[in-house]
Amino acid sequence: MNVDDVEDRDGVRLSWNVWPSSKIEATRTVVPISALYTPLKEREDLPPVLYEPVTCKPPCRAVLNPYCQIDVRGKLWICPFCLSRNAFPPHYKDISSTNLPAELLPKYTTIEYTLSRPAQIPPIFLYVVDTCMDDDDLKALREALVVSLSLLPPNALVGLITYGTMAQVHELGYDACPKSYVFRGTKEYAPKAIQDMLGLNPGARPMGAGAPGAPGGPSQAPRPPNATAQMGASRFLLPVSQCEFQLTQILEQLQKDPWPVANDKRSQRCTGVALSVAVGMLETTFPNTGARVMLFCGGPATEGPGMVVSTELRERIRSHHDIDKDNAKYYKRAIKFYEAMAKRAAGNGHTIDVFAGCLDQVGLLEMKGLANLTNGHMILADSFQMGIFKQSFHRLFQKDDQGHLQMGFNATLDVQCTKELKVSGLIGHAVSANKKSGCVGETEIGIGQTSAWKLCSLTPRTSAGIYFEVVTPAGQPMQPGSRGLIQFVTHYQHASGQYRLRVTTIARNFAEGGSGQIAASFDQEAAAVLMARIAVFKAEIDDSPDVLRWLDRMLIRLCQKFADYRKDDPTSFRLGENFSIYPQFMFHLRRSQFLQVFNNSPDETAFYRHVLNTEDVNNSLIMIQPTLMSYGFEGPPQPVLLDSVSIRPDVVLLLDTFFHILIFHGETVAQWRKAGYQDQEGYENFKEVLENPRADAQDLLADRFPIPRYIVCDQNGSQARFLLSKLNPSTTHMSGGMYGSSGNSGAAIFTDDVSLQVFMEHLKRLAVGASSN
């Protein structure tokens, strides 16, 4: 089985592709049976299926798939999950062994149904914009927002809230002059108060009554509460085609917050109130409808609910050290506030994106729940003028071949499995849908105690880690060739306005515990990423040393189980081909910014962890173990070891860490470049060595999201630290005698970190020695 082909077809990578037949054997394999699933994985050969799916009777409700046994004469099918017999619906009457519908063909283990019920409401985009920033930043942000209006579907509903010292909800339906409803930035508003002030409740009049379209007068006939709320909301949320001119005018005239700021103070910024108003407005008017709240913040919240630092500049925003020492004054209260906000949004299928444009921290750590629980985007840039923000923001609105946005809204993911397996949980950007089906296991990994989750929004990149446990007791006889099945069912609102159901069904064989088939089926790349997600999930709760010890313990146990060795003889230690680079992944994961917070701000740590929990196997591996290409005069570009020995004066290196793309010129290359040899005749070869990495870097930048930081640096330059921090320090200031290493063995790295070689020696010694618990 080629795991890449399976991923292309079904969007699934499994840690094990043959499963242990009993619970005890499954625990001995150390790495749990788990899947990294990309629900909207792009697949061009999927047929359009314009009818409703056939499902098993309740409570099973599994969807018809190629693994079902069918009786074409009796027009029956047997569900492989609950073994119930079901009759085909009347429109399947012409079914025969040579005339099968697409969902029963073996090549369509993944299929997407376009459901007959269209969405009642088009997608909603509510911009929440910070105005406490300098004029250049605000101008760049205004321009980006105006451009984004042209990228939205014409029928999409759009709204605008701006905030600084106060939060203002702009009434787009009033075109006589700019009009907005103002909320005080220091006050915490209950959802009902927000709805009353905006006139969204039946019988309520907005503050400043008499506004056009205000609902609820004594003479009006009663309406359903939601219809009334939507009428009230139509003053604030209008189709783009209807309000583009008005909204563009408001954006172009947007000024910096007028409240005076003393030299020793920060701006008064009420981020929490602005978000409360946005979430309160949407949950009343459009519950369980596809919507995105897009928050653009140019600095930290300094007043009202959700504040992360005071307005006094002499008070620094919290660091990792402050949080560890419980010395972060506003931290716990802010986390609690934003998480409660995120849960309210997620419960209604609404997504919150956070775009930060500031050199200092903006409180992304406290706000991480907004994006993590609603599967929103998180973008971190030094300013809104930077290409990282502008290109990432506009790339969000990419369209498919039919001209629809490549995003799904208000999504749920449901997982079904055969009786031998139970679902332990999901690690990714979701909240539990609290579905207590028979598939729910006792062991909890990530978001557990459910077999369904709300994802709120989806893109073709969204990947979720789902973890399982084997529950078959030991000693129970197993039928030869028996297999287990897992079905992933994703229901979402497509950008075209239709509801769609993507169904992926996979089957894998069971094998006895001692069988070599289990070891041979190990996918070390998928396993590394799925274990990295568990480690990061633990790191959010525990402190890092405990997580590192857990990772080391798991690695030692895996090697003890699957390596070949003679007891107490480290030189005899051998790992099979499909386990050989797993320890290397763990070495780089231990040193990565996901688990080592030194040199990163809390906001950066929150951002890096957010992105890791979004991406598929290949992109996640680049984050864990970056790729390094070498360009020299001796031959074509080639991948080289992520090691200090790869630094040579006569080569150019291209490092891809996913978050950074860095071109590094060796010492000699840098001197020649500065001397301008590349522009002289006869040095075309040198010019090519300089240009090739640039061209390859542009290819990497072309489809990456978020846009990585692009760095060009020279050996011994200050920016070279980005490369040196990622390399295995096989040559350090302590190698090769007292005064550093000799010239040809790579650059010396000044570090006390152990090298991969030392790490592997320790691993071998521990694996072949006494067993580790």
Curated annotation (Swiss-Prot):
A GO molecular function held by the record: zinc ion binding
Keyword annotations from UniProtKB, A to Z: Cytoplasm, Cytoplasmic vesicle, Endoplasmic reticulum, ER-Golgi transport, Golgi apparatus, Membrane, Metal-binding, Protein transport, Transport, Zinc
Localization of this protein: Cytoplasm; Cytoplasmic vesicle, COPII-coated vesicle membrane; Endoplasmic reticulum membrane; Golgi apparatus membrane
SUPFAM superfamilies listed in its UniProt record: beta-sandwich domain of Sec23/24 (SSF81995), C-terminal, gelsolin-like domain of Sec23/24 (SSF82754), Helical domain of Sec23/24 (SSF81811), vWA-like (SSF53300), Zn-finger domain of Sec23/24 (SSF82919)
Recorded coiled-coil stretches: none
InterPro entries xrefs: ADF-H/Gelsolin-like_dom_sf, Gelsolin-like_dom, Gelsolin-like_dom_sf, Sec23, Sec23/24_helical_dom, Sec23/24_helical_dom_sf, Sec23/24_trunk_dom, Sec23_24_beta_S
GO biological process: COPII-coated vesicle cargo loading; intracellular protein transport
Chain sites annotated for binding Zn(2+): 56, 60, 79, 82
Domain of life: Eukaryota
Cellular component annotations (GO), alphabetically ordered: COPII vesicle coat; endoplasmic reticulum exit site; endoplasmic reticulum membrane; Golgi membrane
Family that this chain belongs to: Belongs to the SEC23/SEC24 family. SEC23 subfamily.
PANTHER family hit by this protein: PROTEIN TRANSPORT PROTEIN SEC23
Role, per record: Component of the coat protein complex II (COPII) which promotes the formation of transport vesicles from the endoplasmic reticulum (ER). The coat has two main functions, the physical deformation of the endoplasmic reticulum membrane into vesicles and the selection of cargo molecules.
Protein name in the entry: Protein transport protein SEC23
Species for this entry: Mycosarcoma maydis
